[in-house]
Structure formats: structure tokens, C-alpha cells
Amino acid sequence: SIYFGGGTPSLLRPEEIKYLLDAVGKNFRFSSAIEITLEMNPDDYFAGYFDAIKKVGVNRLSVGIQSFFEEELQQMNRAHTAQDAYSVMEEVKKHFDNFSLDLIYGMPGSNLKRW
């Protein structure tokens, strides 16, 4: 598997992702079942982005939702809103069968009942 992580890979243009994958592919043989994951922030999404990154080989997303609660997102200084998080996940489900969510539990005021 190849994992583009660190929180900001979704700032890369699809052509840049392709360039990196091509560079790695010159030195390593990829399995036909390779999993190529891209970490993304919800606020980096724009129409056509998922189709474009799939076209260059990304077949799994890891989405940095962090929380679906507005006040927690504000405490974390996240750029997206809770509604943005829900909207992006609806788009993710339309385009990817394989994805993960990064969620943060334990913010002040969090509790299991609420979650």
C-alpha cells in the first residue's frame, strides 16, 4: 500500500499525485491489488476532485473529519463545519468503497452518551 498522509496531501493537485506515483513506480513494482490512500481535509474538497484523484490511482480516502459536533470543530480551529463534514462524507460514499474517518474523542465536554 501507499499512504499519502500528514493531513495535507489533499492540497496536492491530481497531476502531482500522479507524478509521485510514477516516480515510486519506477523503483518498485506495484501489486495489482495495491491500496493507494490519500488523507484529506473536508475543506479541500471541490466538485470533480474525487474523480480526478481516482483517475491517477487513488482508491482509498482517509478523511480528517475530527468531529461531527460544531463546538468541537471550533475548539480545534478546524476550517470545516459539521455540515461540511456530513456533505463531504456523502460525496466520499458516492465515489469510494474504501475509506476511513479520523475522529477525535476526548475534547472538553465530550462523553460517550453524546457520541
Language model features with spans:
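Conserved non-cysteine loop/helix-boundary elements of the Radical SAM core domain that shape
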Residues: 2-115
